[in-house]
Every structure is written in C-alpha cells, then in structure tokens.
C-alpha cells in the first residue's frame, strides 16, 4: 500500500508539473516576444531569452497603439476598466436585490418570475446577442458606455446564487428584525448584506473578469475607436492580408491586458476563496 501510495504521489506531481508547463510556456513565449524588437521576433527559431525592448514596446503601444489600431492602448485599458467595473457593480446590485425580493417578499407569481430569470441560462449567447443589439440600436445607445455596460448587468447566475444563499439564512433573523421594527431595507443593509460579504467578493472577482474579457459585445456595439476596449483592441492590432503584424507590440499589449484582472484576483484572493467555500455549504 505504501509503495502504491508513493507511486500515485509521483504520478500526481508529474501531471501537475506538466499541466503547469502547458499553461505557463505560452505565456513565457509571449513575454519573451514582448521584450524583442520587430526584427528579432521574426527570427526562426525565435529566441527564448528575454530581450531589452520591453519598456520601449510598452511605451509605444501605450501612447500610439500598434499596427492598424493607432488608438493609444492606455485609453483602451481605461475603457475596459470602466466597462468591467460598471458591469460588476451593476450586475451585483441587480442580482442581490432581485434575489432578496424573491426570497423575503411575498407577491403573486414570484416563483414563476424566478424561473423565468433562470431559464435565460438555457439560451445560448448567440441567440440573445443580436436581439439585444437591435434593442440597443433602437434606444440610440450605440457607441456609448451605456450601450457597453447596461445590457450585461442582468445575471441569472448571480441571482440564483444569492437566492440560494439567502434561503440558508435562518427565519429567526427576519422575525427578530420585525420585532425590533426594522424595515425590509434596513434588514437588508444591517443583516443580509454583511452576511453576504464573502459571496459578494467571490462574485466581484468572477464578474470583473467576465466584464474585462468581453470581446464580441464591444465589437458589435462600438465603432468609435476612442471607445474601444483592450481585448477587442488586441485583435485589431493584428494585420490582415499581406500586412506584417508587429507581434512584439501585440504581445506587450497582451501582458498589459492580463494585469488588471490578475491584480483583482491577488488582492481579493482570500475573500474569493472564502466566498466559493461558503457558497458550497
């Protein structure tokens, strides 16, 4: 048994190392490419030793963009941050209030409304996205932060998770609040919201990354280059046809795009893990 256990441990560690290398090696190649100049990156085979042009590449794309996209990449990062933060705050606000109303208020057809919200999870994005674009166009929200963020603030998943969490809270909390004369909103802010902070943190991280990584939606909504986002902007830096792509600058843009969600995860890691664990209970 001991020998079998030791062999299983060795196999597990080997598979773990292989998995880590499979994930990190492409990122390392991208980092190396970002440190090279335009001539070095096209040498075959490309070196795996970092060069000395990283800061120059970062400065160029930050101020002037790259390739066919001359919009400063710093502006694209700002647009992505505004979009991701607005989607995150809006999605959490709408979802937690919706779940609170469904669980703690008694009104006709409340369960029907919840299942109508839940059923939207079964519709593919491709089915929902073009009718949503049509609505945004008719409301004259194209090329605006409102059009970028407002349609993505509704979340059946977050509503479902908050509903399930609220249903685990003891009824005695509500009864005690009623005896003390607390209004429904005071009960929400004084009792429910503090108990939900770990769930809020977990959903904040997940939703921020979701908003930051949006690619198709900005492409459909935005035609103004000054409202372009970082993820969509990287694609526009890649030349089409016979044009030459400045891969060193594209990889530098990729590194910058990874930093904000990485910082969010690192800063909120403890709360994020606790929120996921609490949601499983």
From Swiss-Prot:
Matching entries from InterPro entries are given as: MetI-like, MetI-like_sf
How does it sit in the bilayer? Multi-pass membrane protein
Under the heading Gene3D superfamilies, the entry gives:
MetI-like
Q: Does the keyword Nucleotide-binding apply?
A: no
Coiled coil as a keyword of this entry, yes or no, is no
Q: What does this protein do?
A: Part of the ABC transporter complex UgpBAEC involved in sn-glycerol-3-phosphate (G3P) import. Probably responsible for the translocation of the substrate across the membrane.
Q: Which family does it belong to?
A: Belongs to the binding-protein-dependent transport system permease family. UgpAE subfamily.
- Official protein name in the record: sn-glycerol-3-phosphate transport system permease protein UgpE
Question: What organism is listed for this UniProt entry?
Answer: Pectobacterium atrosepticum (strain SCRI 1043 / ATCC BAA-672)
